[in-house]
Amino acid sequence: MRILHTADWHLGKTLEGRSRLSEQADVLDELNTIVKDEQIDAIVMAGDAFDTVNPPALAEQLFYESLSALSDRGKRPIVVIAGNHDNPDRLSAASPLTHENGIHLIGYPTTEPIHIEVPSAGELLAVGALAYPSEARLNEVLSDTFDEKLLRDHYDVKIRQAFEHMTSRFRTDAVKIAASHIYVAGGNQTDSERPIEVGGAYTVAAESLPADAAYVALGHLHRPQTIKRARTLARYSGSPLAYSFSEAGYAKSVTIVDAKPGEEATWQEVLLSSGKPLVKWKAANGLSEVYSWLDEGRDQNAWIDLEIRVADQLSLEEIHRLRKAHPGFIHIRPVFEEQNKDRERIEVKHVSIEDRFKKFYEKQTGGAVPDEEMVKLFLELASGVEEEDAK
C-alpha cells in the first residue's frame, strides 16, 4: 500500500496581509498530480488544514474541492485530523457527506482506531488518528498542578496511553499507521508554527509514539524531518509552502510511505515546486546594490525580506519606489551604519545571555521586543539546560 502523508496546509493564511490562496491552490494541484503519478492508494493529512478556526469561505471551498479531486471522487481514501489551528467542530461538520466518499474528517481526539478498505491496494488500512489533543479537546484536566515538568509528564503519559489504546485495537491483517498533530520533543521548529502551549507543557517524548504502528504521520512542525528516537518510523511531512522567512531556503515536500501488513514501512520524500519562495536579501552596500539586483531580475517570483544598510532613514518615497520595482517586498528593514559599528565594538562574551536573547528575538521578528514573561521563560529554560550540563 502506498500512502501519501501531508500536513499543515494552513489554507487562508496570509503573509503580512498578502493572500497566498492562489499559491495554495497550485500546491494542492501539484499534490493531485503526485498521487496520480505515484499511484497513491490512501492519503493522511495530519492537521492544520486551515490557518484559523474561522477560515474564509474561499479557503473552505478550496479545501473541499481539493479533497474531492485527491480522493478521485471517493476511490482513494483520505483521513484528515484537526490541528491546533483548526476548529474541530467546523472541520468535522461535513463528515456525513464526506464519509460516503471515503473522506474521514476527525475533529476531536479519540482512542478508537478506524479501519478502511483500500480498493486499489486490496488491503485494509488501520489508522490511529489522534487529532490535536489539548486539555480542552480531550475534555479532561490532566493535572491540578502548575508545575511545568509535572504537567509535561502527565500530558506525555496521556498521549502514550491514547496511542497504546488505539494500536491495541488494530486488526492484525491491516497496514497499521498512527497520525497526530503534536509537538514531539527534539523536533526542529520554525517561526510560522503557533506554539501549542506556552512553556512546552504539551510536549510528547519520541519514545511515547506507538511502537505497534508501522508509521506515525505527524503534523505541526513545518520542516520535514524524521523523529530519530521514536520506536518506529515517524515523520513530520512539513508544510507544503513556506509560511515565514525562517523557512527561507528550505525545500518543501510530502512523504510517501510504502507499507504491508506485518512488515516495516519504507518512505521517500517528494519535493514540491509550487508557490513563491521566501528569500532574504541583505544589501550591505545600500540602495545601489538593491537596484542592481532588481536590474538583474533576481528572485522575480519571490516574497522578499530586505535588510538594507543605510546612513539615514529611508524616505517614504524610496520605500514606495522599491515596492513599485518589486511587489514581492514584504519587509524593508533599514540597518543604520552606526548600529553596525556599535555591533562590531561589542564582544559577545561581554553581553549577558538575556541581552543576547533579546537581540536574537528582535532580529528574528524584524524588530519586535520580547515581553517580560517571555524573557523570564527563556532564562528559566536556559538555567535548566546549564544545570543539566553541569551534572
Curated annotation (Swiss-Prot):
Keywords: Coiled coil, DNA recombination, Exonuclease, Hydrolase, Nuclease. It comes from the Bacteria. The keyword Protease does not apply. Pfam families: Metallophos, SbcD_C. InterPro entries: Calcineurin-like_PHP_ApaH (IPR004843), DNA_Repair-Maintenance_Comp (IPR050535), Metallo-depent_PP-like (IPR029052), Mre11_N (IPR041796), SbcD (IPR004593), SbcD_C (IPR026843), SbcD_nuclease (IPR053601). GO terms for biological process: DNA recombination; DNA repair. GO terms for molecular function: 3'-5' exonuclease activity; DNA binding; DNA exonuclease activity; endonuclease activity. Belongs to the SbcD family. Heterodimer of SbcC and SbcD. SbcCD cleaves DNA hairpin structures. These structures can inhibit DNA replication and are intermediates in certain DNA recombination reactions. The complex acts as a 3'->5' double strand exonuclease that can open hairpins. It also has a 5' single-strand endonuclease activity. This is Nuclease SbcCD subunit D.
